[in-house]
C-alpha cells in the first residue's frame, strides 16, 4: 500500500491486511494462503505470521494456514526446473540460437535461505542440460557488504564478464 490512491484511479490498494480485516468483519476467519514465492522469504517467515498475530490480538478468531513456498528445500521442486527447461527450449526455437551460456537470475535477497532456492534450481538445471552448456547465476540487485556475498554477482557484472570472455556466443 505504498502507492498513493491517486495513482490507482483513486482507489487504495488492497493489502493482505486490509483484505483479511474485511473478511473478518464479514465473519470469515479461516484462510489458506498459497504463496507465489520460490523460497522462504521474510514475508513468509516473519511478516505474515506477525500480521496474523496482530490481527488475532485486535480481532481474535483468525485461523490462517500458510503452505510451503514453491520450491521447499532441501528437496526442491523438479517441476520448476522442468518449466525453466521448457522456456529454454522455446527461446532456442524462437531465436534459432543454440545457447552455450545461460544466466539464471533472481531478484536478490538479504536471506541466504531464499538465495539457496536459486542455487538449487541452477544445480538441477546443470544436471539436466547437455554437457557444455554453462549455467551462471546472478542477482538483479543486492545489498552492499560481505555478509551478502551469498547472492553472487550482479547480472550486469556477469553479462560484462561473459561478453569479455566471448562476445560472439549466445
Locate each region found by the language model.
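Active-site-proximal alpha-helix that buttresses catalytic centers in soluble enzyme cores
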Residues: 1-170
Amino acid at each position: 500500500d505504498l502507492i498513493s490512491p491517486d495513482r490507482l484511479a483513486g482507489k487504495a490498494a488492497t493489502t493482505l491486511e486490509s483484505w483479511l480485516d474485511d473478511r473478518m468483519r464479514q465473519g470469515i476467519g479461516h484462510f489458506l494462503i498459497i504463496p507465489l514465492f520460490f523460497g522462504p522469504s521474510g514475508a513468509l517467515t516473519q511478516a505474515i505470521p506477525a500480521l496474523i498475530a496482530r490481527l488475532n490480538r485486535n480481532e481474535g478468531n483468525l485461523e490462517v494456514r500458510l503452505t510451503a513456498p514453491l520450491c521447499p528445500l532441501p528437496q526442491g521442486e523438479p517441476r520448476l526446473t522442468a518449466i525453466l527447461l521448457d522456456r529454454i527450449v522455446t527461446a532456442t526455437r524462437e531465436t534459432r540460437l543454440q545457447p552455450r551460456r545461460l544466466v539464471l537470475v533472481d531478484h536478490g535477497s538479504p536471506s541466504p535461505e531464499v538465495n539457496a532456492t536459486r542455487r538449487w534450481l541452477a544445480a538441477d538445471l546443470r544436471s539436466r542440460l547437455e554437457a557444455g552448456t554453462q549455467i551462471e547465476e546472478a542477482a538483479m540487485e543486492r545489498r552492499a557488504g560481505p555478509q551478502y556475498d551469498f547472492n553472487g554477482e550482479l547480472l550486469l557484472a556477469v553479462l560484462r564478464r561473459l561478453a569479455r570472455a566471448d562476445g560472439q556466443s549466445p
